[in-house]
Amino acid sequence: MFKKISGVNKEQAVHSLKLWAICFFQYFSNRKLSRIIQFVERTTNTLDEKEQEEEKAMQTSVIGFPRIGTLRELKFASEKYFRNEIKAEELLQTAKDLRKAHWMTQKEAGITFISSNDFSHYDLVLDTAVLLGIVPKRYQELQLSALDTYFAMARGYQGTSGDVKALAMKKWFNTNYHYIVPEAEDDTVIHLSASKLFDEYAEAKELGIATKPVVIGAYTMLKLCRFTGEKKAEDFIGDLTAAYQELLKECQKQQIAWVQFDEPALVRDMDAQDVELFHRLYDAVLQEKGNCRVLVQTYFGDVRDVYQDLTAMDFDGIGLDFLEGKETVRLIEAYGLSRTAFRLTKSCLRDLSMERIFGRIITRKHCRR
């Protein structure tokens, strides 16, 4: 269950885990803390005979990696670019250097599934909007470079090519971060129109790292969009579905093993129409996944309104929130997981309290059959 740490024996590791659980007492109820410590004690008794087997089975994934740089390199380079002190090539090189450093840090740490496309020059929602061709006409008409059009959407533009304000910003769920609100017009044609996701995958592959591309999922993207004309969200479902299908087809062409769809909107209150919309999108999208495995990643809470639907669908992995997701453990204990996707035994289910600490993604390979 645990990776072997050089120079640390079993007893030291178990003792450290107990102390760690106690230090994080404020995040857990007495009952859950007790279950964590009981799990650690059970592990002590079984670690010896299962050590090699569990080490092979243990895999780790991160949702994404901070992009700004340890010395805020991205911030300073971006500000210089906005002041016309450096050219686009220098900004792009800084970004490339940061991505390399971040990927290598994760590789050296032994992370199994390292994310790509989690880097952004400004905002990941804006990145996804550009990926899907959701670019309002007023920005296209500026006839700027792709990079400057992107920044015009994020910051506004006043110059020889025109004068436009930035897109609106809204709070990103329950955080202090604000995202750029995508804006779909009546004549917007959603389609796969940018290559950033695949470019960064290829960039990491040149370093010997096969990454897990990350992109905001279709349901969350539709919920975050602002529709400025006569059309409503449902009018864009067909094109949006086709765009994500095309994305998965391209992933297969490039032999990408895993792709992560971030769906934090699933933790919000969902009525029957919302659940139906989620099915309508992903029942179609997942038909095109082929050999590419799809992880649906949630965060900022639990998915109580869609949990049973989620586990019954053809996802290959589900990322659940065991910190802010107050109902997550109860949902798993009450409803279990899909037999086809997650073959959990009772012993594995009892150990799920540790998922809250380690934040592991539960997939087929993590569970005893």
Which residue ranges define each predicted feature?
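N-terminal, intrinsically disordered charge-dense segments
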Residues: 8-10
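Low-complexity, intrinsically disordered or signal/transmembrane-proximal segments
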Residues: 12-15, 26-27, 38, 52
